[in-house]
Amino acid sequence: MSSEPAYERLGAKVLSLPDVIAQSVGFMGPIFSSAFVIPLVVGVISASGKGGGVAAPLSVIIAAIGVFALGWIVSSYAREIHSAGSLYDYVTRGLGKRTGTAAGWLYYGGIVVLAAGLLLLIGGYLQSTIQSEFKVSPLPSWAWTLIVIALIAVILYFGVRVSTRSQLALALVSIIVVTIFFVTVIVKLGSANSAKPFEPSSAADGWSGIFFGVLYGVLLFVGFETAANLAEETPNPRREIPIAVMATAGIATVIYVVATYVTVAGFHYSLKTVAAAAGAPLFALGASKSAGGYGGTWIDRLLELVVLFDMLAVAIGCCVAATRGIFAMARDRRVPASLAVTSKKHGSPLGASAFVIGICVVALLLNQFWTSLFALPQTPHYFAMFAWGSTFGGFALVVVYFLMCIGSLRSFAGAERRASIIVAAVIGLVITGGAIFGSFYKVTSPTIEAPYYAVALLVIGFASTFVLRARESASTALADLSASASR
């Protein structure tokens, strides 16, 4: 008789379709990305010096095609595997246990590092925004970060429904407000609206620039697939997870195309003007008419508030995805079993939550006491830490997307949908391969160190398979975590 302990379980299956969509949209943070990342796609802040330029919306559309291809693969796996491990289980199914374990280390390690960096940014954003708008500074940035960490710890403890409903409220408010603002800008532009942003000839560097815009544009969508981490807590994951993944890709595409168009058109199709506002183009557009914007003081303050809301949604989404994935890996003994401990009352992953919160606290201490770590010239240290962490996280996730695409060719070789999988995998490999290239091309120190550290984590994850005594994946050992249980 086997003495192997039973597989640990998460809480009840209580999530609805809006909940799992909220996880993907919340993690992705379309308003946060629209506020700060669009200039990267345009090319005015990219390491390569290239981007889509005036044709940046076209770059986003092409990137979205690649994301839909990735979404098709994720959806295909999600119909078969209903485990909280998501991409870790998908890569395991396609490329074997060792590579799957390494991918899990990289994927969830990337999300944790991204979350830690983002929490530092939220603290700095709160302190600097309150200081600039109201000329007071009630708390230093580290204190704001600590408060947000504590808030997220409470949300994680009380269960997944609290987490997803928090994301839904924060993301929905921010999307509605910013969408109304974008429509207002388009209306005010009047006859200045143009189809130029959708014409390849508008790109200063031609198709080369558009290509680089696509590479950076893919990063806008990172995290769109994380609804899959909630499969175990969803009554009908075979139906709802694929819908959530593809719906999120669609929602994001519309928001990003409109946001990129408004950024380019709102600054009168001038890359110099976009570059001048590259630090926060959304807020520059929200400024008064005399300052070259389309709003005023109260509009700008409202935009600052909803961007904060979206940042909080991203932070919650990162922590929810990371805790579920780490729990799943610990349950399979791919990482220490203590990380699979759950709350008896709420069914939340206590061990994984404590680990993620602990890493965020360590990052806060590093930010405070090791001020030369990943430092950038004339840049607040919290922002430098975020820039490094987001580079690490974005690269980590894109590499795992790449591995998932390769594995899908094997996983679905005999499936009825194999033709569509082959097409999606080829498109996905091209898009993610390009994004990986963009993570290295002309990137300078210390940012260039991030992908190398990520590769090191991938190697460590692979090496761990020779040390840790893993067991059969729950996604294959437990009947309700496979397709047959929900048919």
Regions found by a protein language model. Give the residues of each.
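Membrane-interface "cap" regions at the ends of multi-pass membrane proteins
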Residues: 1-54, 67-68, 72, 194-198, ...
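Helix-loop-helix junctions that connect adjacent transmembrane segments
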Residues: 6-11, 53-57, 133-142, 168-304, ...
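Membrane-interface loop-to-helix entry segments
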Residues: 15, 140-191, 205, 245-253, ...
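A generic transmembrane alpha-helix motif of multi-pass inner-membrane proteins
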Residues: 29, 387-388, 392-400, 406, ...
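Extracellular loop-to-transmembrane helix junctions
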Residues: 30-136, 141, 448-465
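Transmembrane helix-loop boundary segments of multi-pass membrane transporters
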Residues: 40-57, 129-141, 161-170, 302, ...
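Membrane-helix boundary/coupling elements in multi-pass transport proteins
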Residues: 83, 106-123, 221, 226-233, ...
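TM-loop-TM module centered on a large, flexible mid-protein loop between adjacent transmembrane helices
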Residues: 89-91, 96, 128-132, 244-316, ...
